[in-house]
């Protein structure tokens, strides 16, 4: 029988609860009693604080699924895990330490990363290797840290301070669209 996946969920560096894979493809999120007793807020509007687990019968709850990388970053992260097929839950556990927003997902038994699967001459892919960030969306982006006016990729187990966005050959108008809508 395969081991079921699980991870610890943090909200603003406070341990909030457990995300668990259950038999049959279900995934549950359960708030930890210390988080509930501490009077902390819900980690999401769709996941109110309560003692009973939040159950998603078909994989990750949409809140957690929306934290998983997409596009080129998802592909690079899958290659880095060294397997042809990787589930969304596996990606979230492996790279959810630094998600956009206040949530971190920590894998108690982190996966070994296979850098042999990446193009180490590509700065974007090299940055994937040095970070465990998960950023959703089709536009190429990386979690970065600003130090004295200089930006560099976030390192493993280091929270980012900014998100760097890059042009996309597949979506050439994204940068202009973002500029015009801000």
Regions found by a protein language model. Name each.
Residues 1-182:
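Phosphate/dinucleotide-binding and metal-coordinating scaffold of catalytic cores
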């Amino acid at each position: 029988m395969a081991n079921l996946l699980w991870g610890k969920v943090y909200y603003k560096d406070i341990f909030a609860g457990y995300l668990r894979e259950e038999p049959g493809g279900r995934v549950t999120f359960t708030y930890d009693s210390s988080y509930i007793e501490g009077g902390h807020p819900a980690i999401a509007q769709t996941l109110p604080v309560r003692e009973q687990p939040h159950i998603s019968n078909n994989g990750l709850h949409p809140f957690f699924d929306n934290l998983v990388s997409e596009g080129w970053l998802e592909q690079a992260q899958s290659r880095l895990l060294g397997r042809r097929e990787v589930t969304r839950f596996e990606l979230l556990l492996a790279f959810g330490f630094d998600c956009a927003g206040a949530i971190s997902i920590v894998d108690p038994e982190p996966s070994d990363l296979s850098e042999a699967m990446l193009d180490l001459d590509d700065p974007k892919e090299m940055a994937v290797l040095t970070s465990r960030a998960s950023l959703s969306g089709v536009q190429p982006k990386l979690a970065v840290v600003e130090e004295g006016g200089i930006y560099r990729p976030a390192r493993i187990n280091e929270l980012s301070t900014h998100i760097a966005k890059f042009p996309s050959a597949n979506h050439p108008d994204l940068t202009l669209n973002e500029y015009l809508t801000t």
